[in-house]
């Protein structure tokens, strides 16, 4: 029990440091020193497909808060990136090619993550998003640990993805970073990881805690948890008596064609941006500028090009 308690304590400390925590929400910010340059932009400036980043559902990650470097990277590749605070309707989604939703929450959970998870989206909004993707739109849906995964679960389920509302992590006593590679078959071969040429092939990715899910048969796994990862049935802080189960084979990233559109689902948000925890001395930086995440930037560009229809479906 004492070993288990120590592991959970370390787990909580590590994941809060790397990603989310209500008490630290204001001290984790967009990294102003992040390198968001693109050597070979795919589009002329502001001439690419339009990407909307949701901020209308109490999102933890928005352009202004923690996803600024993500938006800057896309703009430097030529994408037209906008913030959207609107409820999802056919009219509100019609201008966009790609919709990005990261870590949405219902109003009841904004200030109390201990409450039971509930959907961040109404049933009507979920139906609208599903129809929009079926008609040719593309969705990037991202949700971290409990209750964020639980708040995205109904939307994910509309596309056949089944989220575990917990925290998936390696035993923190192990000490290794969460790095997924082609060499160990935790990062899989796909058009997204192959990119458009030899210079955009992805062989390694780093993530920072997060959640796991099961995917429908038509989905293509990209990031797969190997032996040694556990799903902890808790939010943060994680209590010592939290139940845990083997997460081997669960996914942290997958893509899928859906009707005329495309869907990408990921159980971790920090990998897509560059953030800094300002109250630590020295400030702690994590995201695509962290050690071991050197290929994350190119992966983001590959993924967005796939969602925008620039890369082939397969």
Locations of the language-model features?
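Short, surface-exposed patches at the edges or C-terminal ends of soluble domains, predominantly
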Residues: 24-314
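Bacterial N-terminal signal peptides that target proteins for export
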Residues: 1-10
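Bacterial N-terminal signal peptides
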Residues: 10-19
């Amino acid at each position: 029990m004492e070993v288990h308690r120590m592991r959970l304590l370390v787990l909580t400390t590590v994941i809060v440091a790397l990603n989310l925590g209500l008490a630290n929400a204001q001290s984790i910010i967009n990294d102003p020193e992040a390198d968001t340059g693109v050597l070979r932009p795919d589009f002329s400036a502001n001439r690419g497909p339009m990407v909307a980043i949701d901020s209308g559902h109490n999102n933890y990650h928005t352009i202004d808060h923690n996803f600024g470097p993500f938006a800057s990277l896309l703009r430097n590749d030529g994408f037209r990136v906008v913030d959207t605070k609107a409820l999802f309707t056919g009219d509100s989604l019609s201008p966009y090619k790609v919709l990005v939703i990261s870590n949405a929450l219902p109003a009841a959970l904004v200030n109390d993550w201990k409450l039971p998870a509930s959907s961040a989206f109404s049933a009507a909004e979920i139906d609208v998003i599903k129809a929009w993707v079926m008609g040719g739109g593309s969705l990037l849906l991202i949700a971290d640990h409990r209750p964020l995964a639980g708040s995205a679960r109904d939307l994910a389920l509309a596309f056949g993805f089944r989220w575990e509302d917990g925290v998936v992590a390696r035993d923190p006593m192990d000490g290794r970073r969460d790095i997924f590679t082609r060499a160990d078959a935790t990062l899989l071969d796909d058009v997204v990881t192959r990119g458009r040429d030899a210079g955009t092939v992805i062989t390694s990715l780093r993530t920072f805690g997060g959640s796991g899910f099961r995917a429908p048969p038509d989905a293509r796994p990209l990031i797969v948890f190997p032996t040694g990862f556990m799903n902890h049935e808790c939010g943060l802080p994680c209590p010592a008596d939290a139940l845990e189960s083997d997460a081997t084979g669960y996914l942290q990233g997958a893509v899928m064609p859906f009707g005329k559109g495309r869907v990408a689902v990921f159980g971790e948000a920090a990998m897509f941006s560059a953030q800094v925890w300002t109250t630590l001395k020295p400030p702690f930086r994590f995201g695509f500028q962290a050690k071991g995440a050197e290929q994350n930037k190119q992966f983001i560009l590959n993924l967005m090009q796939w969602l925008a229809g620039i890369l082939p479906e397969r």
